[in-house]
């Protein structure tokens, strides 16, 4: 009997990542999640690892552990940090931190995941971009730049990995009620929502629904796409 699918989720301690961890455990997956901080919850068939996604040695060690499971089906690159600040007031170390987590971390996880996925000629990678890219939101220069890089990374990897049976897509979840947007004022939140075709918060279930589609075996022809929830 074939073993259950193995899914890796970065940034799984809270918010979207935690919801997705529970969602895929309920679907019968073995889920490995990671974050910089520890968790105060537990799930059956879930393992949590503390690491910085931008630390290459730590990422390699994680995937050595995953290799022992005999398979890797899905990578959901949810880990990310945001910054709302005018470019002239943004220190360089803040920019470096954003790029390390959002771009370098995503790249390292994609690379290591692909090395395992190619063995079975099957894999699904879902990266997280942001509506800040097409909306060109003021005050989010560094964040938008990092998420634009995620789109480019997704498109190039889709071409590099397609012949190996691995698809690579991106999702921009829009505004979801998580810690990432709780610092926004009501006025700023309404301004951003007004620029979407569907001007409301996305639900966690809606985010999971799109990812369900992208990682399904039947979606093997879908790759190199960025899907923006809310339609900016």
Task: Write out the residue ranges for each language-model feature.
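Alpha-helical segment proximal to the catalytic Tyr-Lys
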Residues: 115, 159-163, 220
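Active-site helix of classical SDR
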Residues: 110, 146, 154
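Substrate-binding pocket helix/loop in short-chain dehydrogenase/reductase
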Residues: 86-87, 94-99, 181, 192
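Active-site loop immediately N-terminal to the catalytic Tyr-X3-Lys motif
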Residues: 88, 135-141, 163-164, 199, ...
